[in-house]
Amino acid sequence: MRQHIGRHILGAVLAILILASLCGCGMGTGAGADPTPAATTPEPTPTLSPEEEAAQQERQARLAAQKDGYLLDKGYLYAVDETGELRSNTYVGVLYFREDGRYTSGSEDLDRMVAGAIRKSTDEKMTRMDMLRAMYEYTRDHIKYVGFGNHEDSYKAAHGKDGWMVESATYALENGTGNCYHFAATFAALARGVGFQAYAASGLIGSEDQEHGWVEIVDDSGEVWYSDPETEYARSYWMNQKYDLFYKSKDEIGSVTGIGYLELTDPFEAERKEAEAEGRPLPSPAPKT
């Protein structure tokens, strides 16, 4: 009986050894062993959707083609230097571009609303001046005049003080109402959003020195251009007079409206004070004649 069991055990062991030698997976590292580990299937690399990939390629192509200028992406403004690289952590005139290259007013809420207005009102076929005109008309048509509006903002603006543009533009875009200072602040914010050196100015107009707010834009040559969306709105709405007060010289806007414009403060100096108070880098002055 024992001999019978022993023969069965011996046969089983021999069978295992034979199978091991045939399949090359012998015990130990003999000639039949394969020291190379079995290949593993790599994890699939996440892929963009066709729409995301197309959008990414389009942005890259636009960046490569754009030199020393501005680029809009989903309503947000970026600046590109002469080599095609994004400007970041720097000012271009009064426009500040943060670490990721995106322009910011210093307020995420205002940036979001400005980008939304740009997306609604512009397209890539427009020239920058077309976009500026669209922002002017957006301001004129989307704010309803309600007298003094936000009194604190109005007081600061009317008395030639600084620090009111962001606050007043945010109020007007959120509520759709405001006075001349809110119109001015909103257009200045939107104009900056499409890459213009725009300032919300406050001062006195007319022979009676009436307090008023308007916008001044400094072009690349240093010339100053005036825009007054609130006066255009008011004369159209209440007096049925059709004026075009977009991007005029000081003489032109005075001859059209019959009023003169006198600044109480230099808008650029107000910008410097605001940046200094908040601990931000000081903007470099845009040339101004």
What are these regions (language model features)?
Residues N150, A158-L173, T177, A184, ...:
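Catalytic cysteine-centered active-site loop
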Residues H4-T29:
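Sec-dependent N-terminal signal peptides of Gram-positive bacterial secreted proteins and lipoproteins
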Residues H182-K248:
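Hydrophobic/aromatic-rich core segments of domains that either
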Residues M131, M135, G176-A191:
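Active-site nucleophilic cysteine motif
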Residues L22, G26-R112, D130, G203-L204, ...:
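Extracellular adhesion/carbohydrate-binding repeat motifs centered on closely spaced tryptophans
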Residues G75-Y76, G93, S221-T289:
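His-Asp-centered catalytic microenvironments across diverse enzyme cores
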Residues E108-A172, T265-E269, A275-G279, A286:
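Secondary-structure boundary elements
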